[in-house]
């Protein structure tokens, strides 16, 4: 885990300063997870850690949009299907909020 944190700093993913989070709370650091996608080796390291935490699963689904690449990668690693969650239910076509056979 220490190697992963060091890579976060090396790739400028952990920022220090004054930040307002989505919740409105203030923080003196920020982890910009969307930058992880730019670094394949780091993406693999993060997904390896996520994979270790999953005990048993028939499907995987990431919270849109930021977690979808992580879910996709872990799904490929584990050979399990990915469910695609939409932020909002579609009002056309099949009108689904979740795409996939579950």
Which residues does each predicted region cover?
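Active-site-facing substrate-recognition patch
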Residues: 1-53
């Amino acid at each position: 885990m220490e190697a992963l944190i060091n890579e976060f700093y090396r790739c400028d993913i952990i920022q220090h300063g004054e930040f307002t989070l989505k919740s409105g709370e203030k923080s003196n650091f920020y982890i910009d997870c969307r930058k992880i996608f730019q670094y394949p080796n780091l993406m693999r390291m993060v997904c390896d850690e996520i994979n270790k935490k999953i005990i048993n699963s028939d499907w995987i689904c990431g919270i849109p949009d930021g977690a979808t690449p992580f879910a996709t990668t872990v799904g490929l690693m584990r050979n399990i299907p990915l469910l695609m969650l939409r932020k909002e239910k579609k009002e056309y076509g099949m009108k689904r909020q979740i795409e996939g056979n579950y």
